């Protein structure tokens, strides 16, 4: 089945709209543009699709309301602008969706909300309940309390995380660009447009400029990485221009617009997906070659004897990263021991744990049922 048909058949969509598509060149909200987005999403709802909207624009609206001509550099001022602007963003979306008799809900999330298992499940339950009630959730990062997301702004990642959270069928990232090219078309006249590819392939990241490039910072690279993340849960991604007329309706009808990135695998188990979606891990363990082989090829649990080093501070039950000697992450899992305990039993046989600690919580540092390979 063609990817376009898969998108057309998708029941649950996450739509991410960038700041340039909802603001007047960064100076306050463009209510006419938001009205068009509301109309398009209303049409999707009428066609039987569930839609979650991830929208930027709060800081731009806050600056307008506060009378600031230039974007401030101080984090606390950006946070203040976000707090003021979030009111306007919610008001405009509410009024425009009301024209179509659709209720909206404002949901502000942080990475911490999705890293904590209980809060993650609560957020998931709330969003699924809203969708079942016919409500369109409007999601944004809680910029008022988060600093890194303002500094490096990345609602593309948030869109992917939300897609995984609600087990969405597809992520649609709308931007002011047509999609992905083999090179920067502004600099390379030979750049070719990529209409379809498999998400997560290394070539895509190179096309987008690679990590740390001038092209990639806050640009296409974040979208490529978001597609890679969404693909882990079996969701396909479309990167398309929000300037295209009726782009959502046309995509939903199966029309080929933008770059279509196919998920290579089926949906992952929910708990393992949650572990992969951790953006900030508090600890990691370095494994010897034998442990790496047993995890990746043998499907075994991680035993303390295979750990050569414990880095960071973490508690029992937290998600930790498992890396090889070169620092390459090979797996993630829920640890049965704290970092302090892990340091004591590292390089020890499981039979020695009780002699070292005085007790045994488990024979494994990470059981294979609580382990996900990357």
UniProtKB/Swiss-Prot annotation:
<dbReference type="InterPro" id="IPR036974">
    <property type="entry name" value="PUA_sf"/>
</dbReference>
<feature type="binding site">
    <location>
        <begin position="175"/>
        <end position="176"/>
    </location>
    <ligand>
        <name>ATP</name>
    </ligand>
</feature>
<keyword id="KW-0418">Kinase</keyword>
<feature type="binding site">
    <location>
        <position position="56"/>
    </location>
    <ligand>
        <name>substrate</name>
    </ligand>
</feature>
<protein>
    <recommendedName>
        <fullName>Glutamate 5-kinase</fullName>
        <ecNumber>2.7.2.11</ecNumber>
    </recommendedName>
</protein>
<dbReference type="InterPro" id="IPR011529">
    <property type="entry name" value="Glu_5kinase"/>
</dbReference>
<dbReference type="GO" id="GO:0055129">
    <property type="term" value="P:L-proline biosynthetic process"/>
</dbReference>
<keyword id="KW-0808">Transferase</keyword>
<keyword id="KW-0028">Amino-acid biosynthesis</keyword>
<dbReference type="Pfam" id="PF01472">
    <property type="entry name" value="PUA"/>
</dbReference>
<feature type="binding site">
    <location>
        <position position="16"/>
    </location>
    <ligand>
        <name>ATP</name>
    </ligand>
</feature>
<dbReference type="GO" id="GO:0003723">
    <property type="term" value="F:RNA binding"/>
</dbReference>
<keyword id="KW-0963">Cytoplasm</keyword>
<dbReference type="GO" id="GO:0004349">
    <property type="term" value="F:glutamate 5-kinase activity"/>
</dbReference>
<dbReference type="InterPro" id="IPR001057">
    <property type="entry name" value="Glu/AcGlu_kinase"/>
</dbReference>
<dbReference type="InterPro" id="IPR005715">
    <property type="entry name" value="Glu_5kinase/COase_Synthase"/>
</dbReference>
<dbReference type="InterPro" id="IPR041739">
    <property type="entry name" value="G5K_ProB"/>
</dbReference>
<keyword id="KW-0547">Nucleotide-binding</keyword>
<keyword id="KW-0641">Proline biosynthesis</keyword>
<feature type="binding site">
    <location>
        <position position="143"/>
    </location>
    <ligand>
        <name>substrate</name>
    </ligand>
</feature>
<dbReference type="GO" id="GO:0005524">
    <property type="term" value="F:ATP binding"/>
</dbReference>
<dbReference type="InterPro" id="IPR015947">
    <property type="entry name" value="PUA-like_sf"/>
</dbReference>
<dbReference type="GO" id="GO:0005829">
    <property type="term" value="C:cytosol"/>
</dbReference>
<comment type="similarity">
    <text>Belongs to the glutamate 5-kinase family.</text>
</comment>
<comment type="function">
    <text>Catalyzes the transfer of a phosphate group to glutamate to form L-glutamate 5-phosphate.</text>
</comment>
<comment type="pathway">
    <text>Amino-acid biosynthesis; L-proline biosynthesis; L-glutamate 5-semialdehyde from L-glutamate: step 1/2.</text>
</comment>
<dbReference type="Pfam" id="PF00696">
    <property type="entry name" value="AA_kinase"/>
</dbReference>
<feature type="binding site">
    <location>
        <position position="155"/>
    </location>
    <ligand>
        <name>substrate</name>
    </ligand>
</feature>
<dbReference type="InterPro" id="IPR019797">
    <property type="entry name" value="Glutamate_5-kinase_CS"/>
</dbReference>
<keyword id="KW-0067">ATP-binding</keyword>
<dbReference type="InterPro" id="IPR002478">
    <property type="entry name" value="PUA"/>
</dbReference>
<dbReference type="InterPro" id="IPR001048">
    <property type="entry name" value="Asp/Glu/Uridylate_kinase"/>
</dbReference>
<feature type="domain" description="PUA">
    <location>
        <begin position="282"/>
        <end position="360"/>
    </location>
</feature>
<dbReference type="InterPro" id="IPR036393">
    <property type="entry name" value="AceGlu_kinase-like_sf"/>
</dbReference>
């Amino acid at each position: 089945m063609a990817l376009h048909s898969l998108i057309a058949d998708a029941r649950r969509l996450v739509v991410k709209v960038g700041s340039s598509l909802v603001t007047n060149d960064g100076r306050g909200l463009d209510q006419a543009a938001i009205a068009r987005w509301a109309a398009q999403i209303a049409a999707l709802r009428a066609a039987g699709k569930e839609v979650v909207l991830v929208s930027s624009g709060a800081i731009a609206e806050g600056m307008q309301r506060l009378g600031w001509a230039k974007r401030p550099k101080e984090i606390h001022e950006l946070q203040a602008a976000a707090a003021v602007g979030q009111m306007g963003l919610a008001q405009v979306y509410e009024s425009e969706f009301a024209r179509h008799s659709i209720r909206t809900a404002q949901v502000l999330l942080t990475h911490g909300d999705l890293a904590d298992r209980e809060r993650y499940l609560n957020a998931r339950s709330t969003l699924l309940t809203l969708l079942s009630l016919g409500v369109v959730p409007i999601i944004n990062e809680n910029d008022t309390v988060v600093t890194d997301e303002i500094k490096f702004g990345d609602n593309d990642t948030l869109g992917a995380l939300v897609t995984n959270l609600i087990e969405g069928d597809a992520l649609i990232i709308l931007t002011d660009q047509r999609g992905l090219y083999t090179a920067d078309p502004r600099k390379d006249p030979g750049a070719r447009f990529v209409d379809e590819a498999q998400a997560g392939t290394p070539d895509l990241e190179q096309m987008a400029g690679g990590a740390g490039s001038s092209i990639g910072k806050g640009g296409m690279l974040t979208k490529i990485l978001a597609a890679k993340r969404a693909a882990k849960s079996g969701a396909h991604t479309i990167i398309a221009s929000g300037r295209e007329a009726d782009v959502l309706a046309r995509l939903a009808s199966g029309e080929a617009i933008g770059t279509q990135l196919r998920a290579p695998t089926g949906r992952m188990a929910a708990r393992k997906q949650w572990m992969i979606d951790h953006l900030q891990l508090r600890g990691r363990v370095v494994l010897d070659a034998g442990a790496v082989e047993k995890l990746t090829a043998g499907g075994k649990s991680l035993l303390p004897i295979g750990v050569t080093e414990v880095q960071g501070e973490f508690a029992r039950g937290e998600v930790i990263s498992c890396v090889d000697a070169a620092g390459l992450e090979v797996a993630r899992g829920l640890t049965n021991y704290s970092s302090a305990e892990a340091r004591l039993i590292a390089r020890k046989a499981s039979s020695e744990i009780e002699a070292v600690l005085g007790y045994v919580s488990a024979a494994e540092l990470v059981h294979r049922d609580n382990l996900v390979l990357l």
